[in-house]
Amino acid sequence: MRFFLTFLLFLFTLFSLFVYDFLRKKNFYLDLDLDIRTRTVKELILNLERFFGLNLYLNFKDIKFEKIIKIEKGKVVVVSFKKRKKKKKFLLKNIPIREIPINLKIGHLDVWTGNEGGVNRVIVKDASLINNELEGEFLYTNLRSFTLNGSIKAKIQRDTLTLKDLLLDSEYFSAKTKGEIKRNTGEILAEVEIKEIRKENFTLSGTKINAKGTINLPVLDINAKAFVKDLIVRNKNYGSIEGIVKGNYELFDKLFLKGEAVNPEGTKIKFTYDVIPEGLLTFSFENLVVDKNTLGINREIRGEFHGNGKVDFKKMFVKVNAFTENLEVIDKKFKGDVLFSYNFSGNGSLNFEFKNSGYAKGNLIINKNKLEGEFSFNDFPVVFQDFNAYLSGEGKFKKGKIFEMEAKIFANNGQFRDFSLQRISSDVKIRDKEIEALVYYGNSFGFVKGKFDNLKGFIQLNNFSLEGKEKSIKISHGSIEFSIQGKSINSKGKLGDLALNLSNIYAKTELEFNFNKKNEKITLEGNGILNVRFKEKSVLENFKYSLLLLDNNLRIFGASKDSILRVVYYISGRSGEFYGKIDKKEFGISLNGEIKNKDVKANFEAFYALLREKIKIKGKIETKEDQVKISLFPTQLRGKRFNYRFNGLNVFLEKENLSVEFKGLDVSLLDKKLLSISPSKGVGTTKNFSFEPVKITGVLNGVLNIAYKGNLYLKSSGTLNLTLLSKHIGSLMKSQMFGKLDYEFVFDGNELKFLARNDEPVRINSLYFYEPFGSAMNLELRKDFFAFALTGWFREGFLNAYAISKNFRDFEVEFVYKNLPVKLKDGIRARIEADGKGKVVVKNFKEIFLTLDTLLDGYVKVKKLPEKKEEEKKTLPVEITLDINFKTENGLIVKLPEGRVYTALNGRIYGKLPEPYYEIDVVLKSGRLEYFGRKFFVKRSTVKLLKEKDKELTEFDFYLNTVSDGYKIFLLVHGTPENPSVYYFSEPPLSREQILFKLISGGVNEGILPVGTVLANELKALGYVKGTIERLFDVNVEIGIKTSSTGEVGALVKLKKKLGSYFSLYYQTASTKDKKDTFWGAEVRSPGSLDLGFSFNVYSDNTREYKLRYVREFDF
């Protein structure tokens, strides 16, 4: 205690004699509250102004002088008000590290430092220096809101400072440092992590840096390695960057860094940074890829840039040069460069130029608060979000106190999303807050003029169109007027023939509307006529509708002959009701319900016509807060061919939780069970959902798995029982199949795969072939691909067919066959062996092309030819074009009702159905036919059938001969069916009449060839024969022909002899088979005016017939 007081007295004496007078001149202030008894300084205040360019303020409280000096609380403020003069170079060759003989604890110390560069603050907490071991926590902040938390553990031992743990943590990075420092050497290791940065279009993942510092005074050498996993600019990831940094730091004099970084894409960046004393950063880059992902657009653009730049922090200047040799925009490549310079005083410039077959160039001058620039384009592809086009034009702008711009721009070959655009031209002028713009789009145009808060304009539409892949928007004509005043908008318009075409949906409407918005009040009125088609089927036709939004009430009404819509919604009350119905022959749907707040209740009913039956479903929909319930009620159908029983379906959704209960389905065809699908339940969320395995039995036997994980997933495998299927549809197909197909089905989002094949041969009995055959089938179905292969083998023949499609609208089918045993029925029976090949091409389900080359041999039996019926020409749903070439190799045996002929064919059928052209030559090589009970032998005869654009005919030449009573008779029947003629002669020669009587002496069989008919018609030439017989025998002769109901044609000869005035005898003979055509009889007539007669006939079958006739005239 005595030593402590003596030491304080000594210090006070020195302070009074030597220091006080000097400090007093420096505005020195000292306030000391000392408690000598407890060796405690309760408070120490020191204020010193203009002390070597510093203002210094200290305030310490509760300083206790014990074995460990304790400072409970303190504050230090140091403010510099003089600029430092450049000092001479100072080399620190060693650090005065030595053990400190005192122990110290500080509870809270607040240190403030400030100069013209800013203010810094360090708060030290719970710091201690005991036995040369240092521990403590600190918090650093500055006026830029940068905050750094830290803690330190270190130890001083002799001349060595061991840094056990220095931990730093901030919003942007954290670090962990260890090391050992001696008087002139040392090593420091640091692990630094740059924290993740996420901005709107920029993401930098957490970056790790491992650094090592080697001290060899006066120099500190720095080596660091860094790895950046993700560096994302919009949708482009420049990540997986590896970099190294090297440098050296001469304490208080120089700091120099250099480094480089590279990523897997080949981008390389190098830099040098002279931090002290020059403050100069230079850098270069290579292969910096800029593409559609970098720019966040949906159009192809890509370029690799290289360049260099520098930043001079002393002169406050930045300059960057960038170049590219291959900027690919849409379908063109450009060379170009970009030059940017700027000094921090506010002056700078930007120049760019890209050129090839087209070009884009421009310049911008920055002069503090003024901007001035110009630009020009020529056939330059421009991409902005979902819009791209080739631009030509020029413009200029400047901004000082006001903004001014003039530009004329033309856009060709434009595209917006999937739509192709017509030519666009624009002329725009802006001055201050006023704009005047004229825009042309194809034959349409628009104009706007006024201040930005008071605009008026109009749009005139003429053949406006947006064309896309399988979709389009077209407006034949229309006009729209609009004005904008502050928050008020007024618009009215009329659109004629607004047509929307989306794949299978086509909608067309005419619309008139008025729209007004004033503050928050909106009025909308419109009406029109709507037509909608789905897959060429009419859904809505001449649907007249109107809508009205007035006083927060929305009303929509619409109707046509088979549909109706009614919606009423009260916006202020958040309630309404709706009703809609479509009632077509093929399908129908009705829906009615109500809306209250966000809750909806609706009942619906729908049907679809399938196999001449109506498949119906009924159900209801309910929504309440976060819940949605959908129920399909059980329904059943018992039709003539098709039956089903649907047991119901329930869907429940609450927020994202989803559950489904499917209660099963049974399907029957022709009263036979076709398919059963077992009940199943599914649970999950709207993002992840799955069903219990669904069992399928019947014609299909297998298991179906259903799941949803971002995409719908379906998987099924099993067998298709063709034997069972034939029992259901065999009568329709006129075939029976015996066997099965193994199938596999997978659907995963947009990917579809269906495979089916048979391991064992499938046996087929078909009415179209006169022998059963075995077959192999292979089917492959994918999202944009279809293929089917069929091989059939017979005893001596085969059939191979292959079908393929790449878009499910266009198909190609190729087939080849040999010794194909074809069988025909329905009036013409045939057993034909055919060799050939062919192809069927289907285009968009609207056109079918069939080409076929085939050889025919075999046997044909014709009972009768189908009668031609005159029907109205019907338009086929598709256009079918034929090109069929056929001929016989060995010939065809044709069995007709009148006999048998051996024929050869050669022909072509071509053109479009239902009236194709044809050219067919038929040769009857030989044969035997029977007419009038007589056999005729066929010699080489021909038939020619021809139909061309302006010509249609059938010509024939039949050569026949027969033998009668030792006479050979030769016939030639030739001509056309409408005008046939016959030529005949005999050996030995007979007269024409004699030949005919010999030919028709027997009966006539029904025939296909026109021989019998021609001969019967030839009897009309016998008129003069009749007269000769009447004169020779004094009898009345009648000659004629008769055609029976069966088609039999024969000759009739009737002789009649009068015996007096009232009695006659007669005799009739015929060449037909009918017994009633040959008879004899007598007739008696009364004398005078009384018309009374009696006759009898005795037929060839000995039956008799008696007739009494009385005729009397009455005068009324």
UniProtKB/Swiss-Prot annotation:
It is a single-pass membrane protein. Coiled coil: none annotated. Its main location: membrane. One of its GO terms (cellular component) is plasma membrane. Keywords: Membrane, Transmembrane, Transmembrane helix. The chain crosses the membrane at residues 3-20. It is found in: Membrane. Disulfide bonds: none annotated. GO terms for biological process: protein secretion. Pfam families: TamB (PF04357). This is Uncharacterized protein aq_2054. It comes from Aquifex aeolicus (strain VF5). The lineage of its organism: Bacteria, Pseudomonadati, Aquificota, Aquificia, Aquificales.
